[in-house]
C-alpha cells in the first residue's frame, strides 16, 4: 500500500490508540495501516449498488495553538502533533455516520445495496487506490463522494459540481539554482524558484 507509515510508527500509533481507550481487538485489525472501513446495508429489495465515500485521513500538519484559532479556543484542536484534520475529515466522518443512521432507519423504503466507504489517505489518492485494489468498488454501480470546502453565504445547503476541486494531478519537477548567502552576497546566487 502506498503511503503507509513505517512499522515502528504504526506500532506507536496503535499503542497510542489503545492508551486513549480504543478497543485492542479492533486496533489489531488495523495492523499494517489498514484503517479503511466499509459498511454495507443490503435491503430486502433488488436494485443497484450505490456507494458514498467519506475520507477520514488527517494531514501531517501542526495545528495552531493560539487563542485566535477557533478549534484551540473552543477546545477541539488536535491533541497530537502533526496530525490535524485540516481538510474537514472530522466533518466527513460525521456526515457518513449520520448517513448510516438515516439509511438504517429507512431500510424498508430502500432498494438494492448501499455501501458507506470510510476511506483513509485521501491525499494523493493513496487510500482510494488501495481500496479499489481490495475490490471495495467492484460491485458498485454509482459512487458519490464529496469534500467540505466551500463557504455558504446563508444557512441554506450548498452543493457544487466541479471538474477540478475534487481531483488530483501529480507533477514531478526539478529545480536547479546556485546557492549564496542571503545576507552577505545574495547577488551571487540564482534562485530557480523565482525564475
Name every feature range the model reports, one short phrase each.
Residues 1-85, 94-98, 102, 109-110:
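Acidic/His- and Gly-rich active-site-bordering loop/insert found
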Residues 77-81, 90-91, 103, 108-195:
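Histidine/acidic-residue-rich, glycine-tolerant segments that coordinate divalent metal ions
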Amino acid at each position: 500500500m502506498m503511503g503507509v507509515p513505517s512499522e515502528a510508527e504504526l506500532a506507536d500509533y496503535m499503542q497510542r490508540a489503545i492508551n486513549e481507550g480504543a478497543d485492542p481487538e479492533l486496533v489489531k485489525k488495523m495492523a499494517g495501516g489498514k484503517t479503511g472501513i466499509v459498511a454495507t446495508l443490503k435491503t430486502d429489495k433488488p436494485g443497484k449498488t450505490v456507494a458514498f465515500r467519506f475520507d477520514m485521513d488527517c494531514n501531517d500538519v501542526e495545528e495552531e495553538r493560539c487563542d485566535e484559532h477557533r478549534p484551540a479556543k473552543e477546545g477541539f484542536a488536535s491533541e497530537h502533533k502533526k496530525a490535524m484534520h485540516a481538510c474537514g475529515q472530522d466533518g466527513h466522518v460525521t456526515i457518513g455516520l449520520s448517513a448510516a443512521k438515516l439509511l438504517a432507519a429507512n431500510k424498508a423504503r430502500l432498494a438494492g445495496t448501499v455501501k458507506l466507504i470510510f476511506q483513509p489517505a485521501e491525499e494523493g489518492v493513496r487510500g482510494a487506490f488501495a481500496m479499489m485494489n481490495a475490490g471495495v468498488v467492484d460491485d458498485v454501480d454509482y459512487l458519490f463522494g464529496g469534500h467540505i470546502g466551500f463557504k455558504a453565504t446563508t444557512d441554506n445547503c450548498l452543493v457544487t459540481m466541479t471538474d477540478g476541486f475534487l481531483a488530483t494531478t501529480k507533477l514531478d519537477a526539478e529545480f536547479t539554482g546556485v546557492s549564496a548567502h542571503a545576507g552577505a552576497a545574495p547577488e551571487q546566487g540564482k534562485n530557480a524558484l523565482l525564475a
